[in-house]
């Protein structure tokens, strides 16, 4: 849906359709699962609200939606591990991509943590727009804490990239495009490391392609 919204903004700017879809995808409270049971989709939903506001400046919609955003984030936070990170749990579908090769979905996936961090940053923005400053401070603390953990947890000097996942605190040797691409998009790494990723991952044809 988030990709469709971006095409909509570019071709039609039909914000009403985007709003209705965001509402429908969110569903009703209480939250009992991730959106479509897919953890990635929950984070994309938060990011779609961020995009919507950036394209439209529609504070009223964000204020109306904020209680549903908060309850969904409470669901996510209630399922974090001892590191404050997310992992697939019973009933979750960790999708990532329809990759042609093997894609490990176990443990702490760097890709999911990057999306989770950006979702928390989205909550900071939306809480402020909704006038919920205490919430905003709480989300800011959580996002800052998670962001500081990303490099120590997933950066590999050997690979010159973020590794795909960690299991039991141990880095895998697998490197995929997903986390590295989003970390560059969101400026989560230094310029030096972004350039390393460009060569070691983004321009490297041996890395599993995105489908």
Predicted features along the sequence, with ranges:
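Active-site core of glycosidic bond-cleaving carbohydrate-active enzymes
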Residues: 1-211
């Amino acid at each position: 849906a988030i990709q469709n919204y971006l095409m909509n903004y570019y071709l039609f700017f039909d914000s009403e359709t985007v709003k209705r879809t965001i509402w429908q995808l969110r569903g009703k409270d209480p939250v009992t699962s991730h959106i479509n049971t897919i953890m990635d989709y929950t984070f994309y939903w938060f990011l779609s609200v961020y995009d919507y506001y950036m394209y439209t400046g529609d504070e009223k919609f964000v204020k109306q939606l904020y209680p549903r955003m908060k309850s969904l984030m409470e669901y996510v936070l209630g399922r974090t591990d001892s590191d404050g990170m997310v992992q697939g749990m019973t009933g979750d579908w960790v999708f990532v991509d329809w990759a042609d090769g093997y894609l490990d979905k176990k443990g702490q996936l760097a890709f999911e943590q990057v999306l989770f961090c950006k979702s928390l940053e989205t909550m900071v923005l939306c809480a402020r727009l909704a006038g919920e400053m205490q919430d905003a401070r709480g989300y800011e603390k959580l996002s800052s804490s998670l962001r500081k953990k990303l490099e120590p947890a997933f950066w590999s000097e050997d690979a010159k990239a973020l590794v795909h996942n960690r299991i039991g605190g141990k880095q895998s040797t697998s490197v995929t495009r997903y986390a590295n691409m989003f970390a560059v998009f969101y400026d989560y790494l230094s310029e030096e490391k972004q350039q390393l990723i460009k060569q070691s991952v983004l321009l490297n044809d041996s890395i599993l392609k995105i489908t």
